[in-house]
């Protein structure tokens, strides 16, 4: 079972953090409780605490050439780092077209709302670094 996640991703924080959050929410698989912004405008970073006490650390690189990278750690402190180098946006567009063709929803509404709620809390937290902001 996943105990902690260290996540890195490219792009501007407010716009692109959602892509890291999608994977983090899937990996942690429990509701997020609160967030703390620990970075600067130039070097965004944050901590997410989940309802079961587990945490995730994330950083956002303001560099679109950077790739997504996730280090997943289990309770025995074994870690595995996964770097995602796929053509993410092409795959996204393919899935979007498939959705319009079939109407099949690949991600639940609840998961989408969870991701957006964490993103909103992170944006609020970025105004007051090093203070916890509850997920609403």
Positions of the model-derived regions?
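Rossmann-like dinucleotide-binding domain that binds NAD(P)(H)
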Residues: 2-67, 110-117
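A general structural signal for well-ordered alpha-helical segments in protein cores
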Residues: 20-21, 89, 93, 119
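NAD(P)-dependent dehydrogenase/reductase Rossmann-like domain
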Residues: 49, 80-83, 134-136
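Residue-level detector of conserved, well-ordered beta-strand and adjacent loop positions
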Residues: 59, 73, 136
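Interdomain hinge/lid region at the active-site interface
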Residues: 64-104
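C-terminal helix-rich "cap/oligomerization" subdomain common to oxidoreductases
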Residues: 99-136
């Amino acid at each position: 079972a996943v105990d902690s996640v260290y996540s890195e991703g490219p792009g501007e924080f407010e716009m692109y953090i959602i892509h890291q959050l999608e994977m983090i929410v899937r990996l942690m698989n429990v509701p997020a409780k609160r967030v703390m912004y620990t970075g600067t405008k130039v070097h965004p970073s944050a901590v997410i605490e989940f309802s079961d006490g587990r945490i995730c650390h994330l950083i956002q690189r303001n560099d679109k050439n950077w790739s997504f990278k996730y280090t997943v750690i289990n309770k025995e402190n074994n870690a595995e780092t996964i770097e995602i180098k796929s053509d993410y946006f092409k795959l996204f567009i393919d899935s979007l077209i498939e959705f319009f063709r079939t109407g099949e929803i690949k991600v639940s509404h609840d998961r989408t709302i969870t991701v957006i709620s964490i993103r909103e809390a992170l944006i609020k937290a970025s105004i007051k670094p090093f203070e916890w902001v509850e997920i609403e």
